[in-house]
Amino acid sequence: MKNVKIALTKGRLEKKAIEIFKTININTRELEDKGRKLIFNCENEEYNIELFLVKAKDVETYVEYGAADIGIVGKDTLMETNKEFYEVLDLNVGKCKFALAALPSFKLDQGYNRKKIATKYPNIAREYFRKKGMDVELIKIEGSVELGPIVGLADAIVDIVETGNTLRENGLVVVEDICEISARMIVNKASMKTKKDEIIKIIENVSEVIRQ
């Protein structure tokens, strides 16, 4: 049985993925009492798995370069970049959406001034406005993008919305939904050939859980 390395996004998706892994009998004991560890041995009679926790944006890099065979990451991260791997499963967890949001007075199709849009996801925002045939100025922000319209930096924002509470608390409203997103499983292209049996087994078992 070949060793399969899985890169997992820290935080909210980590917990959801661990629940799925437990359901298919992957050994998650070390993950449940991890302390400051980043690498975990999940080996048992059914699987020979090594799992490590990384930031969302790094999951793709580990998988693309083969340091990880499988990755669990949000679709938002995949949409913003253009890296080489297979996207094999929608895990149906970590569901949220991309949306255009602004102060209630904002009107997308009014005025002649070029709109300023604050976002952590410039590529996604650029494609959204390109499809609308609109020329906008994108302002990349790493922190709380909700501040943009409030302090006058931007007219609106493009960001992930889960419950909408953060928007409401800051006086913003959703102008338009852009797309739904959720957690995905990605696989290194070379690993799909060299560790095909082990990886297909994981994909099929996870698929069965998702369908239930």
Swiss-Prot record:
Q: Where are the transmembrane segments?
A: none
- Key words of the record: Amino-acid biosynthesis, ATP-binding, Cytoplasm, Glycosyltransferase, Histidine biosynthesis, Nucleotide-binding, Transferase
> Record's Gene Ontology CC terms?
cytoplasm
Q: Which reaction does it catalyse?
A: 1-(5-phospho-beta-D-ribosyl)-ATP + diphosphate = 5-phospho-alpha-D-ribose 1-diphosphate + ATP
EC identifiers of the protein: 2.4.2.17
Which pathway does the database say it acts in? Amino-acid biosynthesis; L-histidine biosynthesis; L-histidine from 5-phospho-alpha-D-ribose 1-diphosphate: step 1/9
Question: GO biological process annotations for this chain's record?
Answer: L-histidine biosynthetic process
Top-level taxon: Bacteria
Principal subcellular localisation of the protein: cytoplasm
What does the record say about domains? Answer: Lacks the C-terminal regulatory region which is replaced by HisZ.
Q: What does this protein do?
A: Catalyzes the condensation of ATP and 5-phosphoribose 1-diphosphate to form N'-(5'-phosphoribosyl)-ATP (PR-ATP). Has a crucial role in the pathway because the rate of histidine biosynthesis seems to be controlled primarily by regulation of HisG enzymatic activity.
- State the NCBIfam families in the record: hisG
Which protein family is named in the record?
Belongs to the ATP phosphoribosyltransferase family. Short subfamily.
Q: Which HAMAP family match?
A: HisG_Short
What's the protein called, per UniProt? ATP phosphoribosyltransferase
Q: Which organism does this sequence originate in?
A: Clostridium botulinum (strain ATCC 19397 / Type A)
The primary gene name is hisG
